[in-house]
Amino acid sequence: MGSQTPDVREPFVAEVVGNPSVVYRKAFFLEVHTEVWEKALDNPFLMGQIWALYRCQPAYQVTQTDDGIHIVDPTGITGDLRRIERAPLARVFYGRGTFDHWAIPSFFTADGVIVFEWKETPGLIAAEATISMRGNNWISRAVMKLFSGTLMRRIDSRFTNNLESLRIILSDIERNPQKIREGLGREDI
């Protein structure tokens, strides 16, 4: 893993990946079949609905947009996320977000590129996530670099906690999909 190169034909992606303010990497395992993992990555709005159904924390508010999703995080992060590449054993997402927090100036915005790569084995996914973030102005970039240690710890904590909730959801999707269909009131999933 670590070999997936995002689509750098889009200049904003090349800028984020080529000159990030911070980069976070995490290897992880999921006890789920590849088809379930890929469908989860390919349907972020549906996953947001399931996240809400399970009352996972943080309680993200997820709405669908023309080309992806809009996410409001109760801790003050608001952003848009869209998939920019779908390759065998990899997905790449691009996001742009702002922070709405009393301690962070309103002009603090950042772009991010998230690359998920994985290897398949029967019933197990060995994956890696790489999150590259770049501040949208020199002040944002300077603050992100200055507080990179704190930022990385917060990203790791959030990613790890979200991953635990995701494991429960994916397990139920694979082993008890009717529970989710009934909870969402949909039979088409």
Where are the regions that the model predicts?
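Terminal "cap-and-tail" regions of soluble proteins that handle hydrophobic small molecules
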Residues: 1-5, 113-189
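Solvent-exposed loop and beta-edge segments used for protein-protein assembly and interaction
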Residues: 22, 31, 87, 121-123
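Short, surface-exposed coil-to-beta transition loops
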Residues: 23, 77-79, 107-113, 126-128
